[in-house]
Each structure stands twice: as structure tokens, then as C-alpha cells.
Amino acid sequence: MPPKKHTGFMMFVQEWRRNDAEGRKMSMPQAVSKCGELWKKMDAQQRGPYNGAAKEADVVMRCKVERMNCHGQALSAVQREEREAADRQMDMKRKIERMVLNGKAQHDLENTKFIFAAFNYFTKAITNDIYIPAEFAACEFSLKSGKSSLYSSHINPGQLIFGQGSDTLHHTSNTHQLPLPPNALGEANIGKLYVSIVEYLRGCQDGAGQPNEPLVVFTSTELVPVVRGCFRYLESDSDELQENIEVYDIQYLFYVLKKEVMDIADLPNEHINKSITDNLFVNDFFEYHSGISCQFHEDNDRGKYCTQSKVARWCYMFSDYMCGDLAIKPLPGKHMPPKQEPKFRVINPEEPIENRCFSGMTTTEKSSGNTSFASISSLQTEVKHEIVDHSAFSANLNASEDFPSLGGRKGKRNAEPLAKGVWNVPASNCSVKDLGDAFNMPRR
């Protein structure tokens, strides 16, 4: 049953009860009876405001109250944001697929260039999605050329968000360990840095034949909001015309590119799905490789979190899983980490202990009051490492001489087969008298 509509007369009754001292003492039926006489004496002009108020009350009543979630947000607004996010995600996937398919259609997929970018940050604003950047790195990549260029810079934002020093210290100490502002490293002129980054990205994209399109960079799934927030922070401090920088998911690019590469190589790709490629991407084979991060992170053993190392490792992962399908020869420093001389020495366990000392140490010899110094490194000889069995246990488990107890066990009582009709019960040492006494015991 629909709700009853408001009437001008009832609006007049409610107002009269609120304003009249006599009306406040009356019940609703009494007030209706009293106001009925007054309503009859009123003309159309006097009744107009009450009739208008009744129509407005009907409109308000028809408007449903918006449902809220546990955070006090309107459910319709939350659902609208979710739909918009899903649409943006689908649009991003279509654009990534279009980029890869265009290169495949031109038979030039191995020369299609992509820009990989990553940010390290100090902290995130609580009220919005702005991140305070600490380090930036970007590189240009193609399957044939590998990592062709690199841009890397530390960033000094000058100051942190008030009240977030503890969160910033906790985050940085567990990740990149860069010094906090105002002692941060790198460029302090944010506007100049933003212009420099845009020039580099535009130069890479213009070389790919896309001068008028938005700048597109790829980063890992977990870093997509970080890269967007850091670019937004850099834009806010720049007086230049802001560029449209779109941040795409590199892991979806990895999946699409792998399938198309296998299709070009005429290899079956039905078993390739995003879960497999994501697992390959997350299990970073080059994660702890040295010599590919910035000097600060190399000195502090934090190369895993360095942005320069991240973008380089992404290039190496793409090359490692795809160049072989296209018969592209990998080059050190382009498709794989540069070769490095080993900084260790293999020691033969059979070598005397005096020859295992550090090469920098010296020995002192005294002869007839004269002291001479001789470097131990001159006494060391080049040793070829041989595999030596260091097992502490070398006995034969089946040899009775090594384990005398193997042959000392007692034989089984019924080793021989029993005769037919003989019970397989062990012999009892009890006499007949003992058995009889057992049956005659009093029972409780």
C-alpha cells in the first residue's frame, strides 16, 4: 500500500499545534476538529502556502534514503567507483594488446619499444593518493636491442608530511634505506626534475614514432598506484604544461607479449596463462644480482629495492623468457646482467691451514736480530678445487663387522612350522595347583 499523500489542511493543523498555546494541549483529533472551522474561513490565497508545503513533503518522501556501508560511504558511490576502476582496467588491457598486436601486424614486434619506470617513495598522504618520491628510474626496452637507455635520479622533496615521520622511518628502514629529508640525496628542484623526466620519456616515445600520443610507462602491479601518485606530486610543483602520463601494468604486458612471441615462433601457447607469467615475474631470478643498482644501494647492500635495479631486472626477465623463442642472441648488459669477475677464492680443504690466510696479511721472520716481512700471498699456490667426500659416516649398514649386533639377535621362538593340531600358544610355567588357586580367588 503506497504511503498517504500530505494535504494542505494537515500541514495547517501541524503548524497551528506548534505555534498556538491552546493547540499544544490538544490531541490530534481535537486539533483537527478545531482547525476545520478555521480552514473553512480561509480563502485560496491563504491556503496556498500550505498546499505548496504538502507537495514538497510528497517529493521528499518519494526520495529514498541512501544506504551506507560500514565506513559511512554511499553504496551507490562505491559501486560507481568500482565500475569506473573496472572500466579503466579493461581499457588499459585493450591498449596494451593493441600495442603488441600493432607490432606483430607490422612484422616488427622484436623492435617495438616499451618504457619501464619505477619510483621509491618516503611516505603516502593519508587523505589522498599522493606519494612523496625518493628515487626514480626509467629505461627503454625492446626484445632485439634489450635495455637501450637508462634514466635514474634520487629525489630530495625538502620536507615530509607533518606527523608522518615515524611511518616514513619505518618504511624506509625496511626498504630502500635512503636518507630522510632534509638530508635526502638527489635533485631538490622538483619542477626541474619533472621537466627532465618528461623530456626523457618524450624522447623515447618520439623515437618509437608516437609524438602526439600520451606518454605510456609500464611498472609492476604493486607499483602502479605509487608511480601515479609520485608523478602527481612532481606535476604539482611544476609550472610547465602538464603531460598526460599513463601508467600501465607491466605484468599484463609480459603475459600478452609472451603469448604473441610464441605464436610468431609457431610454438603452442594454449598452456600460457596470466597466473604462470605472474609467477615467473614475481620469482625474480635476477633479484639479488649485484652491479645493476645505483652506487648508494650497492654500498648499502640494498640493490633489491633500487629503482635502477628494478627496471634493469625487468628488461632481463623479458629477454630471458622471450629472446630464445625469436632466436635473438642475448648481449651482456642489454639482455642479461654484465659479466663480472668473481670476488671469491675456492679453497681446497686438503690445503694446509697456513696457506688459507688472507692474501693481505704478512708474516714476520726474525734472523740474527734482523726482521723481514714476507707476504703470505707469495706463499700461496693456485689451487684447483676438487670434490672431496666429507661424510662423517662411512660404515656399511649390512656389514656385521661394522655392526656386531646384527647377528646377535635371538631367534624367533616358533621359527619351525607347527605340527597339525598344535596350538600356537607359548608354554606356561604355572603348575596345575597355581591355576586352580587362581580360579578359587574371592571376587569383589
From Swiss-Prot:
Keyword Transcription regulation listed: yes
Record GO biological process: germ-line stem cell population maintenance; male meiotic nuclear division; negative regulation of DNA-templated transcription; oogenesis; piRNA processing; regulation of miRNA-mediated gene silencing; regulatory ncRNA-mediated gene silencing; spermatogenesis
GO cellular component: cytoplasm; nucleus; P granule; perinuclear region of cytoplasm
Localization of this protein: Cytoplasm; Nucleus
Pfam family, one: Maelstrom
Domain of life of the organism encoding this protein: Eukaryota
Molecular function as annotated in GO: transcription cis-regulatory region binding
Keyword vocabulary terms for this entry: Cytoplasm, Developmental protein, Differentiation, DNA-binding, Meiosis, Nucleus, Oogenesis, Repressor, RNA-mediated gene silencing, Transcription, Transcription regulation
DNA-binding region range list: 2-69
Reported function: Involved both in the piRNA and miRNA metabolic processes. As a component of the meiotic nuage, plays a central role during oogenesis by repressing transposable elements and preventing their mobilization, which is essential for the germline integrity. Repression of transposable elements is mediated via the piRNA metabolic process, which mediates the repression of transposable elements during meiosis by forming complexes composed of piRNAs and Piwi proteins and governs the repression of transposons.
Family stated for the protein in its record: Belongs to the maelstrom family.
Protein known as: Protein maelstrom
Organism, as annotated: Drosophila virilis
